[in-house]
Structure formats: C-alpha cells, structure tokens
Amino acid sequence: MLIQGDASALEWRCASFLSQDEVASKEIWNDVDQHSDNQNRFGLPSRLIAKTFVFRLIYGGSAYSYANDPNFAEVSKSEKFWDKVIEEFYLKYKGLHRWHIKLMQEATSTRKVCLPTGRIYEFEPTIRNGQKVFPRTTILNYPVQGLGADLMTIARVSLFNRMKGKFTDAKLVNTVHDSIIIDCDDKHTDELSQMMLDVFEDVPKNFQKLFGVEFNLPMKAEVQIGNNWKGMEVWS
C-alpha cells in the first residue's frame, strides 16, 4: 500500500511566515479559502486563475508577464488591468508587499539573503545597458522554496524516526516537492496515515526546537492511499 502525505499550501505558508503578513496569517489560521476570496476580490474568472496569479506574484510576476502569458489571455491582455490586480493584491497583503521590498533591498545592498534556518543565498547582478540588474524573480523565489524544503526535511526526518524499528516492512520510498510517500503492508495503513498527519502538524514545534524561532503558523497535510500512485484516494 502506498501512503502519500501532501503538505497543504506549503509555499503560501512559507511566504506568509517569512513576510509575517497579518491578513495571510489570519486566513491560514481560520481555514479561509484565500483563492476563492481573491477570485471575487480581484474580479478573476476562476479560483484556479486566482491561485495561479497569486503564486506567480509571490515569485515576482509582473503586469507585463501576465498580459503576455497565453494562459491568461482570456482574462486580459492589458498591462493596465494586471497592474490594477497586482495593486489590489498588495493592498490586501501589505506585509507581503513590505517583505518583497525588503528582500530586494537586502539582496541588492548585501548581495545575499539569509533565512531563519541558516540558508544563505547569494546573488550577483548582470550588467544591462551599463546598469547592474539583480534577478528579482530569483530573489523572491529562493527564500520561499528554500524554507519549504527545510520544512519538508523536518517532516521527513520526524517520520523516519517514528517509523524506525516499529514498522520493519514499511519504507520511505519517495519525496516529490511537497509530498512524502511510504510503501507499507496494508495492515499498517491507518496507523501510518495518522502518523503522516501528525508529523506535519508537529513541524512548527520541531522548527522552534531546531532553530530557536517560533513558526507561528499551523502546518497541515492531506493523506492519500492506494495500491499505485495513479489510484490514490483521500484517507480519512
């Protein structure tokens, strides 16, 4: 039996934690479907479009990139339209906006960005038309992806330690971005599925133990089970 644990909204939680955005944090704590709210708030045609828009923006998306993306062509090819949506996004998530500005200032002045986990990213500018240009999308992307990788490592090591010696016929077989996969005997499905949920929920506690910093957001996961990766169903 395969058991797959998917971290819920991993990148959004990482961006919300790093920016300490109050609105995003409240939405996470209150289980608000922020993508549906943003769809209505920003006048976008679907939840999926709203979700894609948000994740591109936290990685440095621009009005030009949205207006010239075929996937957004049916929404609008107008940069003015997307400028307005971006403005409304940052008005809602003011903390995220301030963090984006701070990241760029930090990266351009020190040429590096440091994370609470000890990761250090260094950035070198390129020269365009005699001007130094720093890679904005990379600067905004790396901290979120890096913290996500660290949180997944905490969950993975915790799961391995809990399984060790107790489930001799169960193995950690794969990790795919925000997912952890176990292969086990059917008789252990329920116990290991619950364990999978527990290790994700315990990530904030273990984060503070490891790094001495409070991770002040909850972590959650969805667990799926199946005899093969194609036929997974939600475990409950």
Regions found by a protein language model. Give the residues of each.
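Conserved catalytic core of nucleotide polymerization and phosphodiester-bond processing enzymes
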Residues: 1-236
